[in-house]
Amino acid sequence: MITQEDHTTYPLGDGIGFVNLVTTMGDDLTTVNSARVSYGGMSEELTERDEKLIKYLAENKHTSPFRHAFMTFQVKAPEFVARQWYKHIVGASFTAPGDAISHGWNEISGRYVEYEPEFYTPKVLREQAESSKQASKESNTGLMRTAGTLLYCYTKESYNQYQKLLDMGVAKEQARMVLPFNTYTEFYWTASLQAVAHFCALRDHEHAQHEIREYAKALDEYASETFPVSFQYLKENL
């Protein structure tokens, strides 16, 4: 369980990548009252009747009331995870560390800052699945262990080349071109409750990549703690 005192999780277990719940706006009553405003109604406390209304809204795809509650996350993830995440910007807002903006995608810029030597290295490399172009399967073969060594060596060498380019005076915006896709990046994500539910439904799925699934699970736990009724019915009906 996540509490107010413990609002940071480390999805990949490497002590580098994280999801931090920065702030939230609204609660389950936000969904209820935004729906009832059509009739001039308002609830002060969440009742069983209100929960039935939330269930009805979700089951019948009346989704606009779920867009009035928001969550803001600070995320540190490998580039390949962030690029998948980018596809979910519809109905959400992204901003780099600092003041939030109302829309768009912003993250730490390699044009302005020098990248730290922070890279995601999986504990186990997976083999390509024969049944699907986008699926993978676990492997503990010697071949995969050799591939892991290759990945580690390439990552280390790419950062060395990055540093050499910077030392030669090459601009950061161009020197970064040698960095691999497992380089860590950082961004803020502000999203409606509906957008968070949609992200979790698609990315915490058996066909999704393992790494982004772990991030989706972290978001799921935060949303379930903050919006227990609304988020549960949204997930059941997406």
What residue spans do the PLM features occupy?
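Family-specific signature for flavin-dependent thymidylate synthase
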Residues: 1-238
